[in-house]
Amino acid sequence: MEKWGILLLVTLSVSIIFTSAAADDYVRPKPRETLQFPWKQKSSSVPEQVHISLAGDKHMRVTWVTNDKSSPSFVEYGTSPGKYSYLGQGESTSYSYIMYRSGKIHHTVIGPLEADTVYYYRCGGEGPEFHLKTPPAQFPITFAVAGDLGQTGWTKSTLDHIDQCKYAVHLLPGDLSYADYMQHKWDTFGELVQPLASVRPWMVTQGNHEKESIPFIVDEFVSFNSRWKMPYEESGSNSNLYYSFEVAGVHAIMLGSYTDYDRYSDQYSWLKADLSKVDRERTPWLIVLFHVPWYNSNNAHQHEGDEMMAEMEPLLYASGVDIVFTGHVHAYERTKRVNNGKSDPCGPVHITIGDGGNREGLARKYKDPSPEWSVFREASFGHGELQMVNSTHALWTWHRNDDDEPTRSDEVWLNSLVNSGCLKKRPQELRKMLLEP
């Protein structure tokens, strides 16, 4: 089975490998090995790969996997260790992928939950007790941001650094496990991130490594959609590949780079409907995540986002998006506020953060000279932290993984577009775009 899987990997996936090099005078550490996970048989009913995600107002979705197909999909929870005052009933699914058969994947929504509160929970009446902390109901709130994670030594370093920061929600703009058809790597990824993802909600969108389609045999995103169910139904979407959520004064939109996005697509129609409901008094900050960057001065993946940008950028600009996070390019880059290919004080800041630790290495070659809209760029592994201090100001910091120490390498204070007065200039433009058929 393993040999067959390796052959499938070789024949069906194409990896573009970029070696690392110094940005300016920084000397980069050497690449690290792919993590190895010894295969170990556990009790078939013990919950594995536990992670949580936001699931509508005051609710969380708890996801876990068991090998026992008869295990129930309920979660017991409460505010004291070992004392479970509440019970949430859920659903389960499973999938097949050639010779692989997944375990039973459970999804259970719990709540309503109090904000900024620790809850203790147990999955399916078996196994260890876990705990989670709900996000605050108001500012300040901190997001951890890292994309293109994979399962390498650098991934582990990134996760260790994220674990040290006091974040409330993790944002991941695509490329999670780098399973690339080898389905057991979804299982090992779930185990790798469980210590963090079972405690704080992880909100993710898809990247190219989640597609895993085999023509006429396996549809796209089968593994991703089965394992990482996001609140698409709660946000009025008909696809797990695009959705939105609100938390503590922030409206976050997760878009799909690998599903239809033209103005006649379901995604575009949903996006218009979602933006029409945004209340900037309740959620003064508006952020967007997707995988393929629109503003990218790295040599890697040039122009791959151009078509999506042509379709969606005018709508995002008219709506006053503050920040756009992307991945895909295995490096870090931050722009000025931009729109239509040039600096614009009323456009969003674009941040590429595809440097979480993937196995393909770093993309170190950049365009020279750099575009006028590019502020900071470096090919190093790391993560970002976005602290929304209040309704008007946010602090963004990028932390390089430097000799196992989380080095703060880039930071900037951001003023919300609501506070800057930009949105007062374009209400008619936005209404016109939202009303277009």
From Swiss-Prot:
Zn(2+) binds at residues 175, 208, 291, 328. Expressed in roots, stems, leaves, flowers and siliques. Pfam families: Metallophos, Metallophos_C, Pur_ac_phosph_N. The active site is at 301 (proton donor). It is found in: Secreted. CDD domains: MPP_PAPs. Substrate binds at residues 208, 328-330. Fe cation binds at residues 148, 175, 178, 330. Its EC number is 3.1.3.2. Glycans are attached at residue 390. Its main location: secreted. Residues 1-23 form the signal peptide. It catalyses: a phosphate monoester + H2O = an alcohol + phosphate. InterPro entries: Calcineurin-like_PHP_ApaH, Metallo-depent_PP-like, MPP_PAP, PPA-like, Purple_acid_Pase-like_N, Purple_acid_Pase_N, Purple_acid_PPase_C_dom. Keywords: Glycoprotein, Hydrolase, Iron, Metal-binding, Secreted, Signal, Zinc. GO terms for cellular component: extracellular region. One of its GO terms (molecular function) is metal ion binding. Binds 1 Fe cation per subunit. Binds 1 zinc ion per subunit. Homodimer. PANTHER family: ACID PHOSPHATASE RELATED, PURPLE ACID PHOSPHATASE 18. This is Purple acid phosphatase 18. It comes from Arabidopsis thaliana (Mouse-ear cress).
